[in-house]
Amino acid sequence: MGQKTNPIGNRLGIIRGWESNWYGGNDYGDKLAEDDKIRKYIHARLSKASVSRVIIERTLKLVTVTITTARPGIIIGKGGQEVDKLKEELKKITDKEVQINIFEIKRPELDAHLVGASVARQIENRISYRRAIKMAIAAAMRMNAEGIKIEISGRLNGAEMARSESYKDGRIPLSTFRADIDYALVEAHTTYGRLGVKVWIMKGEVYGKRELSPLVGLAKNQGKKSGAGRGGNKSRRRK
C-alpha cells in the first residue's frame, strides 16, 4: 500500500499535520476551492521566491496564511512593502482580513518541493536531467538525509516514446508510518512537452507523540543535525 499512495496523505493524523486547518459546514466546498485558489496564486505570484508549502488557517473573520520559503527577503520586500501588497491581493480573493506569516526554510536541500523545483528549472534551462538529479541527490545526502529518490517521466531528451527513470540513494521505507518522508511532484515545461519530477526524501523516524502541526515537523527537521544517512545503496531503475 505504501508504494501506491501519496506518502504525505498516508501519514496525515499519524506524524503529519494538515495544511488547511479550519471547520466548515455547508460552505466547506467553497472554502476548499478558495484554499486551492490562494495556493495557486501564491506559487504563481512568488515563483522566484522558492516557496514550498502554504498553510492556511481560518477563523470567523481572519485568514492566516503561513508561507514556507527559502528566500523570505523576496516575499517581505524593502520595509515590508511586498508582503503588504500580497496581503491586499489575498484580501480580494477571500473578502476577509488576511494575516501573513513567513517561515524560512534553512535547509532547502531537504525539502522535496524545492528539490523538485530546482531539478525542473535546470531541465527547462537545457541542463542534462541526469546531472541535475545526481547533484540534487548528493546535496541531500550531504545534509544528512537518510534517503532520497527522484523519478522523472516523459519524453526524456526529446525521445519519441515517453519513459521513466528513477535514481535513489539511502533508504525510503514507504510502508513504515513512523518514517518522516517528504514528497512532491513538480512539472518541467520543455519544448518536447511536460516532464514529471517526483521526489521522496527520508528525514528520519518519529517515535512517541508528536504535535500534528505542519510547522512543528518542519522546524525540527531544519534544525536536525544527525550522523551520515543510513544505507549506502545507490541504484537506478529504468522503465
UniProtKB/Swiss-Prot annotation:
Every KH type-2 domain range: 38-106
Region (Disordered), start-end ranges: 218-239
Cellular-component GO terms for this entry: cytosolic small ribosomal subunit
InterPro entries cross-referenced by the UniProt entry: KH_dom, KH_dom-like_a/b, KH_dom_type_2, KH_sf_prok-type, Ribosomal_S3_C_sf, Ribosomal_uS3_bac-typ, Ribosomal_uS3_C, Ribosomal_uS3_CS
MF GO annotations: mRNA binding; rRNA binding; structural constituent of ribosome
Biological process annotations from GO: translation
Record bears the keyword Ribonucleoprotein: yes
Classification via SUPFAM superfamilies: Prokaryotic type KH domain (KH-domain type II), Ribosomal protein S3 C-terminal domain
Keywords, ordered alphabetically: Ribonucleoprotein, Ribosomal protein, RNA-binding, rRNA-binding
Pfam families, per database record: KH_2 (PF07650), Ribosomal_S3_C (PF00189)
Stated family: Belongs to the universal ribosomal protein uS3 family.
Subunit details: Part of the 30S ribosomal subunit. Forms a tight complex with proteins S10 and S14.
PANTHER family membership: 30S/40S RIBOSOMAL PROTEIN S3, SMALL RIBOSOMAL SUBUNIT PROTEIN US3C
Function: Binds the lower part of the 30S subunit head. Binds mRNA in the 70S ribosome, positioning it for translation.
Protein name (database record): Small ribosomal subunit protein uS3
Organism placement in taxonomy: Bacteria, Pseudomonadati, Bacteroidota, Flavobacteriia, Flavobacteriales
Underlying gene: rpsC
